[in-house]
Amino acid sequence: MHVSNVLGIENPVKELGRRVHEQGGYFVVDGAQSVPHVKVDVTEIGCDFLAFSAHKLFGPFGMGVLWGKDELLNAMPPMLTGCEIIYNVKKKDDKWANLP
């Protein structure tokens, strides 16, 4: 969690991310409370993924954003397919469309 919704404390995510990366892990930041109120620079934070919900930005419930580094997102196969997500279909080797 980047910022606490109870106390408003900004957690030391840059330091936490450094520690996670030292152990070979991926660093995922919950930006639900921070994104609507402060400028969040994912490069400065050093996170691999940042997630936040749309309703905190007066958007619809049930929607949100998952930002991720290109190389990590490209390594993940899509959970759902359709709507122009497949670039080329073959029997053994599908090619996914580029990230938006």
Task: Pin down the residues of each PLM region.
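Pyridoxal 5′-phosphate
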Residues: M1-P100
